[in-house]
Design a protein with these regions (language model features):
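Acidic/polar, glycine-enriched structural segments that form the non-catalytic walls/loops
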Residues: 4-73, 182, 187-190, 195, ...
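Short amphipathic alpha-helical coiled-coil/interface segments
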Residues: 389, 396, 400, 421, ...
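Extended glycan-interaction surfaces of carbohydrate-active proteins
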Residues: 414-463, 502-550, 607-608, 658-681, ...
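Solvent-exposed N-terminal domain segments of exported/luminal and surface proteins
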Residues: 11-20, 80, 85-90, 94-95, ...
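Active-site core of glycosidic bond-cleaving carbohydrate-active enzymes
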Residues: 472-476, 480-502, 558, 582, ...
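Alpha-helix capping and helix-loop boundary segments enriched in small/acidic/polar residues
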Residues: 91, 171, 203-211, 465-468, ...
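Short, solvent-exposed loop/edge-beta patches enriched in aromatic
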Residues: 95-111, 124-144, 177, 187-192, ...
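Helix-terminus loop motifs that line ligand-binding clefts
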Residues: 25, 118, 123-184, 489-670, ...
C-alpha cells in the first residue's frame, strides 16, 4: 500500500506540475515585440481641419478659449484639453493593478510609466528609478554580468547615470495578454535565461480579488550552463509618480515591512495630499537570500547601490542610508539564489500600493476605495496586500487561464482577435478607473438592498484625455465588456444613473457651442456623464458643457436599452450557472423575495417590529462578508428597480416626435454622440435607437404586468416602424437623415445591433434590409476606404452614378473618422448575421493597424484618420469589442 500510495502521489504531483506549466507558459497569442521594435508609422494629434469643417466651429473655439483661461486661473485643467494633447508613446504594455485602486503603466521594454494614482488623472512620466536589475555571478563568485532589465537608453547627464542596460534588446521578447505579461531575456552568453511573468488580479465575475491594488512579478531564473550561477534580481522604486513638485511635497519616508512569509520595504508618502504607500515584497524561502535598502538617492548617480550589487550581488542593509540631495527617496529589494547546472528557480516579487481614501479637488467628500472592504482603511495594509498577493496569485492565474483558454483554443477565431479581445480590456482597470464603497447617493442613504452597498460605486473615464466619468453615450458601446464580465459593476453604474435621472441641478453654465445659459441637469433625462475627477464627480454631474445634453436624442434610449440588455444577460448568466457551476464559482444567485433577515443577522442590527416591517423590501442582493460569498443581481428585481426611471425618460423622449410619426427628430444641432456631425429630422442612428427602446419597453411592461404601458409603446412602435421604412430606407441602406440621402453611415444599424444582443431578431429591421445595409457598409465604408485595412469610416458618400466610386464624407471631422468602438460594434453586427468573413475583416484591418503599424497598444484612441493622425488616446468605446465575442458565442451555439 505504501508503494502504491507513493506512486499515486508521484503521478498526482507530476500532473499538478504539468497543469501549472500549462497555465504559466508563454501563450501563442498576444502582443509580441522585441525590445528594439520600431513601428513603421508614427502618428500624432496635430490635425488641421479643412476650412469647411472649421467655419461652423469658430464661435465655439472663441468661447472655449475664454473657458480655458477661466479654468486655468483656478489651477485646473479642462476636462477636454484641445491645446495640450498627448501623443501616443508607442511604448506601452500591460498595466499594473486590479480594478479601481489606481494603476501604474508598464512599457513593453520594462519601463514603469503612465501613473494613475490620483483618481482619474494621468501623469505621463517614465520613472527611471523604478527598475529591475539582474546580477550574475559565476562559480568563483565573480560578477560576470549586471544590467537593468529595461531597454537601453543614453543617460550620461541624467540621474542614475551609472545604471546601465547591457542587455541585447534584440534578444528580449515581450508578450502581453491582459491582465498578464511575459518578458523573456536571453542571457545564455552568461549561462542564464530569465522570464518575468507579470500578473494583475483582473478576474471576470470576481469582486474581491479583482479590486486589489497590486501586481506580482515572478522571475523564473534558469541556469542553462554547465557550472553554478548565483543570480540576483533587485527591484528598485522611488516615491511619487515622477511629477517633481508633487513628489517633493509628499513627505516620503521608508519602512522595512514583514508579513507572514513576505519580507520587503515600503515608502509612506502623500500623493496630491492623499496618504499612499508603495510596498515592495518578496516571498521568503530557505534557498533565497533577501536583502533590503531603505534609502538611496534617485536624483544622484546611483553609484553606491550599483557598485554594491556588482560587488556582493546583494544589498548591504547596515549601510543603506545614502544622503539625499532632494526630498525624493528610493528603496530597493534584492533576492539572490544559487543555481546548480541546468536547474531553475522562481523569485516572487510583488508591488502593492495602499491609498484607501481619496478626495477630489472640490473636497465635498472623502471617498473610500472598495478594496478596503477586504483589508481595511487604516492606510497600513500594504504588507497585508503583499502577503495576500503572494499567497493567492497562483489561483488568480488558474482563473484567468480558465477564462481565456477556450477563446485562445477556438480554431474558428483569427489569431489577431485572440490578442485584441483581451488586450483591449486594459481600459477596465486603466481607464482612470475608480471603485469606491458607497453608502449614499445625491445625499440620500442607500437602502439595505441597493447593490451599491454590496458592490460599491464604479467609474471609468470617457478617455485618458476626455476626463468625464461614465460618459453614457460612449459607455453604451463599452458596456458590452462590463455587463458580461463584471455584471454587478454594470448594475451598480446603472443605479447611479437611475438616481441621477431624478435630480434637478439648476446651477447654470454657458454652453460653449451656442453661448446659451442653461442648467447643469434637468430631471427626467439621462446625464451625459457623472462628473470630472478634477472637480467633484458623482455630485457635480454633467461636466460636459459644450452642448445642452439635457436634450440629446440618444442618451435616454441608450439607458432603456442597457436596462433590458442587463436583464437579459443576468438571466443568461443564471442559466450558465445552473448548467456549469464551476465556470462561475464565485457567483451565487438569489431570487428570494427578501433578504432582510440575512441583513439584520449578519450586521447584528436590532430592530423593532415596526422598523422591520418598514424596511422590508424586495431584495436585489446582499453580500455576506462573513463568508465572502458573492451574489449576482436578480434580473427581475433589477428590472423592477429601473422601470420607473425608464418610463420617465421615455415620456420625455416622446416629446421629440414633433410630427407624431413614431420617430423622434434631431434638431440640426449636435444632439447625440456624433457631436460635430449634425443630424436633422429623423435619422438612421437616433430613430433606430428610439424604435429599439420602444421594443424593449413594450417587453419590460409585459414582464412587469403593465398592460397599458405595453399597448402605448407598441402603438408608437408600429407607427415608427412604418415611418422608418418610408422615410429612411432607400432600398439599399438606411440614409443618414432625411436631408442627407447619399451618406452611408457605418453606425446606421446601431439599434439593431443592440436588439440582437438582447435576444431579439428582426422585429424592427427586416432581415433582407439588414443584410443589404451591412453589404453597403462593408463595400463602401470598409473596403473602399484604405482597402479594408483601417476599419469602417463613419461616413461615406455614394456616387449618383452607381458604376463610379464614391468618397469619404468630409462634411465634418467626425464623418471622416474611423471610430474603433463603432467598428467593433459593426463587426459584431456582421457576426450576428453570419457574415463572419466580413466582420473579422472589418475589425481585423483596424486592429492590425493599431497594433502593428502605428503602435497604439494599451492606448487605443477614439478616432483614426486615413493618414497621419488620430484623436483622443486611451478611450472607452473600443471595449465594444466584447460584443464581438458575445455575438460569436451565440452564433456558435446556433451552429452547434
Amino acid at each position: 500500500m505504501t508503494s502504491l500510495q507513493s506512486n499515486v502521489d508521484s503521478v498526482s504531483a507530476n500532473y499538478e506540475e504539468q497543469q501549472k506549466n500549462e497555465i504559466t507558459a508563454i501563450p501563442s497569442y498576444g502582443l509580441k515585440l522585441k525590445f528594439d521594435h520600431v513601428w513603421p508609422e508614427k502618428r500624432n494629434q496635430n490635425l488641421r481641419p479643412s476650412l469647411r469643417q472649421t467655419l461652423p466651429l469658430v464661435p465655439l473655439a472663441c468661447r472655449y478659449a475664454a473657458y480655458y483661461w477661466k479654468v486655468s486661473r483656478e489651477n485646473r485643467r479642462c476636462y477636454m484639453d484641445y491645446y495640450y494633447m498627448e501623443n501616443g508613446k508607442q511604448m506601452y504594455g500591460v498595466p499594473l493593478g486590479g480594478i479601481g485602486g489606481g494603476t501604474i503603466g508598464r512599457g513593453f521594454a520594462g519601463e514603469f510609466c503612465r501613473f494613475q494614482m490620483r483618481p482619474g488623472m494621468y501623469e505621463y512620466n517614465v520613472v527611471h528609478a523604478n527598475q529591475f536589475i539582474v546580477t550574475i555571478k559565476d562559480a568563483k563568485g565573480c560578477t560576470i554580468f549586471q544590467s537593468l532589465l529595461s531597454r537601453s537608453s543614453s543617460r550620461s547627464k541624467q540621474p542614475l547615470n551609472t545604471w546601465h542596460s547591457n542587455i541585447d534588446d534584440s534578444k528580449c521578447t515581450y508578450t502581453g495578454l491582459y491582465p498578464r505579461a511575459w518578458t523573456e531575456y536571453d542571457l545564455t552568453a552568461y549561462g542564464v535565461r530569465l522570464i518575468c511573468r507579470q500578473i494583475s488580479p483582473v478576474i471576470p465575475h470576481d469582486y474581491k480579488d479583482s479590486c486589489v491594488p497590486c501586481a506580482v512579478f515572478v522571475w523564473s531564473v534558469e541556469n542553462v550552463c554547465a557550472e553554478e550561477r548565483k543570480v540576483s534580481i533587485t527591484f528598485t522604486f522611488k516615491n511619487g509618480t515622477g511629477t517633481k513638485k508633487q513628489d517633493a511635497e509628499g513627505g516620503a519616508e521608508a519602512v522595512l515591512i514583514t508579513q507572514g512569509n513576505m519580507k520587503g520595504v515600503g515608502i509612506r508618502q502623500k500623493i496630491a495630499g492623499m496618504p499612499c504607500s508603495y510596498n515592495l515584497g518578496c516571498r521568503v524561502l530557505p534557498e533565497i537570500s533577501i536583502t533590503r535598502c531603505t534609502q538611496f538617492d534617485p536624483c544622484g548617480t546611483g553609484e553606491q547601490l550599483w557598485a554594491e550589487l556588482r560587488e556582493n550581488g546583494q544589498l548591504n542593509e547596515k549601510h543603506c542610508d545614502e544622503p539625499l540631495k532632494t526630498k525624493d527617496l528610493g528603496v530597493a529589494l534584492c533576492a539572490q539564489v544559487a543555481l546548480k547546472q541546468n536547474t531553475s528557480h522562481d523569485l516572487e516579487f510583488v508591488l502593492a500600493w495602499d491609498m484607501p481614501h481619496i478626495e477630489f479637488p472640490k473636497k465635498h467628500k472623502t471617498y473610500t476605495r472598495y478594496y478596503t472592504k477586504y483589508f481595511d482603511a487604516s492606510g497600513e495594509c500594504g504588507p497585508k496586500i503583499c502577503e495576500y498577493a503572494l499567497k493567492y496569485y497562483n489561483n488568480w492565474e488558474k482563473l484567468i487561464d480558465a477564462w481565456q483558454r477556450p477563446i485562445l483554443n477556438d480554431d474558428g477565431l483569427p489569431d489577431w482577435y485572440k490578442s485584441a479581445i483581451f488586450n483591449q480590456l486594459y481600459f477596465i482597470s486603466d481607464g482612470g478607473t475608480i471603485w469606491l464603497t458607497c453608502e449614499s447617493s445625491f445625499g440620500k442613504e442607500l437602502s439595505f438592498d441597493d447593490p451599491r452597498k454590496a458592490y460599491g460605486r464604479f467609474g471609468y473615464l470617457e478617455g485618458h484625455e476626455y476626463r468625464m466619468y461614465n460618459t453614457y453615450d460612449v459607455h453604451f458601446y463599452a458596456s458590452s465588456a462590463l455587463s458580461h464580465l463584471w455584471p454587478n459593476l454594470q448594475v451598480s453604474l446603472q443605479y447611479d444613473f437611475r438616481d441621477a435621472i431624478d435630480v434637478d441641478l439648476l446651477d447654470t453654465r454657458k454652453m460653449l457651442y451656442d453661448g446659451k445659459i442653461l442648467p447643469r441637469h434637468t430631471k427626467n433625462c439621462v446625464p451625459h456623464d457623472l462628473g470630472d475627477p478634477d472637480e467633484e464627480p458623482f455630485t457635480l454631474i454633467n461636466c460636459y458643457n459644450i452642448h445642452d445634453v439635457n436634450h440629446w436624442k440618444d442618451l435616454n434610449t441608450k439607458f432603456v436599452l442597457q436596462v433590458y440588455r442587463d436583464y437579459y444577460v443576468l438571466n443568461e448568466l443564471a442559466q450558465a450557472q445552473a448548467d456549469n457551476a464551476s465556470k462561475f464559482s464565485s457567483i451565487e444567485f438569489i431570487d428570494k423575495d427578501s433578504l432582510y433577515e440575512m441583513y439584520t443577522q449578519d450586521n447584528k442590527r436590532k430592530n423593532s417590529a415596526d422598523e422591520k416591517q418598514q424596511n422590508r423590501k424586495s431584495a436585489s442582493l446582499y453580500i455576506n462578508e462573513t463568508n465572502g460569498k458573492v451574489y449576482l443581481m436578480d434580473a427581475m428585481a433589477y428590472l423592477k428597480a429601473m422601470y420607473p426611471a425608464c418610463k420617465a425618460i421615455m415620456e420625455r423622449s416622446i416629446e421629440y416626435d414633433k410630427d407624431n410619426d413614431g420617430l423622434i427628430e434631431n434638431t440640426k444641432m449636435p444632439d447625440q454622440t456624433y457631436d460635430t456631425w449634425v443630424m436633422e429630422g429623423p435619422s438612421a442612428y437616433c430613430a433606430g435607437l428610439w424604435l429599439a427602446a420602444l421594443q424593449t419597453m413594450s417587453v419590460m411592461a409585459t414582464l412587469l404586468d403593465q398592460p397599458n404601458d405595453c399597448l402605448r409603446y407598441q402603438d408608437i412602435l408600429d407607427k415608427g416602424k412604418h415611418s422608418l421604412e418610408e422615410k429612411l430606407w432607400n432600398g439599399r441602406y438606411y440614409i443618414f437623415d432625411v436631408h442627407h440621402k447619399d451618406t452611408i453611415m457605418a453606425d446606421q444599424l446601431c439599434g439593431h445591433w443592440y436588439l440582437k444582443t438582447c435576444g431579439f431578431d428582426y422585429e424592427i429591421y427586416p432581415k433582407e434590409n439588414v443584410r443589404s445595409a451591412l453589404k453597403q457598409v462593408y463595400d463602401n465604408n470598409v473596403m473602399s476606404f484604405q482597402d479594408g485595412t483601417l476599419g469602417a469610416v463613419n461616413g461615406f458618400i455614394v456616387n449618383a452614378e452607381p458604376e463610379k466610386p464614391g468618397h469619404v464624407d468630409y462634411t465634418t471631422v467626425q464623418s471622416e473618422e474611423v471610430w474603433p468602438g463603432v467598428t467593433f460594434a459593426l463587426a459584431a453586427t456582421m457576426i450576428q448575421e453570419g457574415m463572419f468573413e466580413e466582420g473579422f475583416q472589418t475589425a481585423g484591418g483596424l486592429y492590425k493597424t493599431l497594433s502593428e503599424r502605428i503602435g497604439m497598444n494599451y492606448e487605443t484612441p477614439e478616432a483614426l484618420y486615413a493618414e497621419k493622425h488620430y484623436r483622443s488616446i486611451g478611450y472607452m468605446r473600443p471595449l465594444s469589442i466584447w460584443s464581438m465575442q458575445v455575438s460569436w458565442e451565440r452564433r456558435k451555439t446556433l451552429r452547434d
